[in-house]
Amino acid sequence: MARKLAAGNWKMNGTGEHLAELENLAQGDLPEGVDVLICPPATLISRAADRAGDIAIGGQDCHAKTSGAHTGDLSADMLRDAGATYVIIGHSERRADHGEGDADVRAKTEAAQAAGLVAVVCIGETLEEREAGTTLEVVGAQLAGSLPDGVTAENTVVAYEPVWAIGTGKVPTLDQIAEVHDALRADLVARFGAAGKDLPLLYGGSVKPGNAAEIFGVSNVDGALVGGASLKAADFGPIIAALAAS
């Protein structure tokens, strides 16, 4: 059985003052049976790791190379040195804003794994692809192209985030989420065997305290990658509790 993971992606939000929200979350009554992850901006990783308690800290991206002339980029080794244990790779905002393709995501995932980080690999279809009826083909191809052969249930997490649901308040129906997650699970098992069965599959896209419980009741949903609702402990805490109760 896959472990449960509640992951928060702060994106480009937060300065040092915002770490009070992390401390509030860490000092609260976190339920057993759920791993909790916060991915703050890179400028906060070291300070966040010092204050996170049992909460894991991750980066939001890494370079595929370990070092070199790559101004503004961070290697997976650097993230690990700063205190990160996870890193998000291939988020749709990176794919869209920086032109990252599946081959780039695969190379970064390999780099993360080599550095000892858990890679949270993101995939998802656009609204046009959803309306064209090609969702399963699109996410299946992204999954195949983005994951290297060395994937295990310990070093990789897959997050399905329909691009049209991120930050829009729009959420797929539960049947639509189930269809995609069941297909992804089948693809993972076909390629990776037992590891594919136990690898956590997260849903992301406008997850909030009010809809988390029903989303976590969907088959093959092992947690969530949460954006805006992870910025405040008062919002993220109930999502974590809903996952624990699922």
Curated annotation (Swiss-Prot):
InterPro entries: Aldolase_TIM, TIM_sf, TrioseP_Isoase_bac/euk, Triosephosphate_isomerase, Triosephosphate_isomerase_AS
Biological process terms in GO annotation: gluconeogenesis; glyceraldehyde-3-phosphate biosynthetic process; glycerol catabolic process; glycolytic process
Gene Ontology molecular function terms on file: triose-phosphate isomerase activity
Intracellular or extracellular location(s): Cytoplasm
Active-site residues, Swiss-Prot/TrEMBL: 91 (electrophile), 161 (proton acceptor)
One Gene Ontology cellular component annotation held by this UniProt entry: cytosol
E.C. designation(s): 5.3.1.1
Keyword Isomerase: yes
Keyword flag Repeat: no
Record: residues binding substrate: 9-11, 167, 206, 227-228
Pfam families on file: TIM
Involved pathway(s): Carbohydrate biosynthesis; gluconeogenesis; Carbohydrate degradation; glycolysis; D-glyceraldehyde 3-phosphate from glycerone phosphate: step 1/1
Catalytic activity from the UniProt record: D-glyceraldehyde 3-phosphate = dihydroxyacetone phosphate
Gene3D superfamilies in UniProt: Aldolase class I
CDD domains found in the cross-reference section: TIM
Keywords: Cytoplasm, Gluconeogenesis, Glycolysis, Isomerase
Biological role stated in the UniProt entry: Involved in the gluconeogenesis. Catalyzes stereospecifically the conversion of dihydroxyacetone phosphate (DHAP) to D-glyceraldehyde-3-phosphate (G3P).
Subunit structure and binding partners: Homodimer.
The family this protein is said to belong to: Belongs to the triosephosphate isomerase family.
Name this polypeptide is given: Triosephosphate isomerase
